[in-house]
Amino acid sequence: MLDFLAANPLIALAVILAVGLAIGRISLFGVSLGAAAVLIVALVVSTLNPDIQIPAFVFQLGLAMFVYVIGISAGPAFFREFRSRGWKLTLFMITLLVSLTALAWVLIRAFGLGAGAGAGMFAGSLTSTPGMAAVVALMDPAQAGDPVIGYSLAYPGAVLGSILVAAVGAKLLKVNHTEDAREEGLVTEPLVWKGVRIGEGISGTIGDLPRLSGQQIIATRIVEDPHEHRLADPTLPIKPGMELVINGTVNAVDRAIAALGGECDTKIEDTELVYSRFTVSNPDIVGRTVAELDPVANGFMIARIRQGDTEIVPHRDTVLNYSDRVRVVAAPGRMGEVRRFLGDSEKALGDVNLLPFAIGLSLGLLLGAIPVPLPGDTTMYLGFGGGPIVAGLILGALNRTGPITWQLPFHANRTISTLGLALFLAGVGTSAGAGFRQALTDPQSFVYMGVGFAITVTSALVCAVVGMWLLKLKWDESMGVAAGATTNPAIISYLNDQTGTDLANRGYATVYPTAMIGKILACQVLFLLL
C-alpha cells in the first residue's frame, strides 16, 4: 500500500487529507487537533516510506492560500489595532526573537551541536522554512543538508509543543474563551430595541446619539404617534420630547436611555414601517461603508448586521461584506427595491468571483519573490508565506479598489483557508519525514529534538506570561501571538478550532509579518555567531 502511495502522489495527498481531517475531528478530553492532525499523518506515512512525497508546489500554494485569506480577514483590524497597541506587540516580538536567538546559541554551545544543524534546528523550533533556507544559502554546498536535518528533527516538536502549551494552559487557567472574546468586543450580546424620549438639554442630530450617550447604538425610527413611524435620518436635529426607536445591546440601550432622557412605551407592529432581513450579495455595494451607501436616501435604515455568527450595531464606517445578513427598516412598498439593492441572492453568493482572490494571491507571491539585500552579500525573500499575508493585510484593509472587492464571502473564506492549510500540512509533513527517519538512527538526534522542543515551549510560555501580565492580553490572543512567533498555520488552526473566536487570529496577524522577517534574520545571525 505504501509503495502504491509513493508511486501516486495525488492519491497519497488525498488519503493523507482524508485520514488527517478525520482524526482531527476526534475529541479527547475536550481537545481535538483539527487540521493539525494532517501534519502528523503525513509525517508518519513518509517516515514509514520516505518515497512518499507531495510535490513542493502543493504545500507552497497551500501556505500562500491560507496566509492570504488570514491577511484579508484580519486586514481591517490589523491596521486599527496597530495604531493602538500593535506597535507594542511588534516591539515584544523583536525582543522575543533576540532572546530566543541568545538562548539557542547557549544551548547549541552547551550540547556541542553542529553550527549548520543547530541553526536548522533553531529554524525548525520556530517552524521557519525561509529561515532554514537562509541558513542553507550561507553554507558550503557540501554541508547544505545539515540545516535541513536539524529543521526536520525540531519541526514536529515545535508544532506539538505550542499546541501542548495552549491546551494545558487553557485547562489550568480555566479560560472562558467566549467571555474573553466578549470583553474584547469580538462577541456581541443579543441586540434589542427600545423607545427613548429625548430629555431637556440634549442637542445635536440623530447621528450624534452614539456620541451623546457614549454607547454603540443606532436610531432607526422616529415615532410620530403610535401608528406613524418614519425613518430616523441621521442628519435630522433632535429636540426635547422627540421619541425614537434605538437598537443595541441590552446594556447599551439602557445606558443610552438613561443618558438621553427616559424610556417610552413604543410598539413597532401596525405601523407604516416594517423590518426584514436580507443577505448582501450585490457586488456593487460590497466593500462600501454604510455612509457611502446612504441607506436613508434609498428609503431604508440598517438596524443590525450579522457577520458570520456575530450580530453588530452598524455605524457610518461599518463595511458591508459578502454574505452579511442585514436587518433593515423600511416602508412595506419599498422592501422589494431594498432587496434588489442589497442583492439577497444565495445563487450570487454561490457564484464566487475568484478573480480578486487570484489577483491578490498573485500580488502576494510577486511580493514574496522580491529580493531584499542584507549585509554580508546575502538576500532575503518574504517567500510564499510572508508575501501573501502582507498583501492580504493591505488589500483587506482597503476592502475595495475601484470595481474590485477584495473580501470573500464568509463560507468561501473558510473553505479556502481550510483547504490551503491542509495542503500545506500534508506537503511539509511528507517532506520532513524522510530526513526524520534517517536522523532517528543517530542518538544525538534526540538532543536536537529536545533542544528544539525546549526553545519552542520557552517561546510559547514567554508569550503567555508577557502577553497576559505585561501587555494585558487575553489567553487566546497571547497564544495567537505565540502562533505568530512560529508563523505556523497548524497552531493557529488548532486555536481557532478550540476557541471558536477571533482573538487568536488578531494576535497572530499582528505579529506575523514581523516574525516572518525577524526569524530569517535571527537564523542567519545565529549561524554566523556559531
Curated annotation (Swiss-Prot):
Pfam families (alphabetical): Asp-Al_Ex, TrkA_C
Q: What is its main location?
A: membrane
Coiled-coil residues are: none
Q: Which GO terms describe its cellular component?
A: plasma membrane
Q: Which GO biological process categories is it annotated with?
A: carbohydrate metabolic process; potassium ion transport
User: Domain named RCK C-terminal: which ranges?
Assistant: 260-344
Topology in the lipid bilayer is annotated as: Multi-pass membrane protein
Q: Which UniProt keywords apply?
A: Cell membrane, Membrane, Transmembrane, Transmembrane helix, Transport
What GO molecular function annotation could you give as one example from this UniProt entry?
Answer: monoatomic cation transmembrane transporter activity
Compartment(s) of residence: Cell membrane
Xref: InterPro entries: AAE_transporter, RCK_C, RCK_C_sf, Transaldolase_AS, YidE_YbjL
Give me the segments passing through the membrane.
4-23, 28-47, 57-79, 91-113, 148-170, 352-374, 379-398, 419-441, 451-473
Recorded hits in NCBIfam families, A to Z, give: YidE_YbjL_dupl (TIGR01625)
In terms of PANTHER family, this protein maps to: K(+)_H(+) ANTIPORTER SUBUNIT KHTT, TRANSPORT PROTEIN YIDE-RELATED
- Spell out the family assignment given in the record's similarity comment: Belongs to the AAE transporter (TC 2.A.81) family.
Record protein name field: Uncharacterized transporter CE0595
